Amino acid sequence: MSQRLDIRGYAIVSDDDKIAGLDGLTPASLRNEKDWDYYQRALDRADLIVFGRRSHEAEPNVRGHRRLVVSREAAGLERRTDAWWWNPGEMSWPDVAGRLLPSGGLVAAPGGQVVFDLFLKIGFDEFHLSRAHGVRLPGGRAVFSACEAGVPVESVLAQGGLRLSERIALDPAHGVEMNVWRRAL
C-alpha cells in the first residue's frame, strides 16, 4: 500500500483508566452527550472503523459506516453481512489495509482493549482520550492491558510514541475533558 493511513483511537475512561465495568459493558457513568457527539462526528469522517467483537455488538451500525471487526473467530479477512471481520493472527494489518483502503484514508479505532492494544503496536497517529472525572470502576476493563498492571494510560500512550498536544474542556459541567495525543515527530 503506497498511500498514507491516519489511525486515530477514541476512548472515554474513568479516573482509574477503565472503559468498562465488571460486566464488560460501558456504564452510564462513562456516557456523556458532548463526548458522544464528538465521537460520532469523528466516526462520520472515517473511511474505516475498527471495533472489537463486543464493541461491535454493543454499538449497532445505524449510520452504515464501513466497519472492520477484530476477532479470533474470523478466517483471515472475511466479508460478512454486518461488516468485514479480521483475525490479526492470520493476516497482517498492511495486507488488510491494502485490501480495504488501497488509496489510504482515515481509520478510527474506538476499541475495546484488544483493538487499542493492537493499534498501539501498529501505531496510532492520534489518540483522543476523554476522561470522566469522579468516576471509578474497580475491577472493570482498562483501556490498555498495561493499565491493568497499574501503568497510567498517559504513560502507555507516551511509550507508544504519542505526546499530549491538545486539551479540550469537553463538558466542564459534568467533569469530562479530552486530551488529544499525537504522534511525536
Predicted regions mapped to residue ranges:
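Enzymes that bind and transform nitrogen-containing heteroaromatic metabolites
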Residues: 1-185
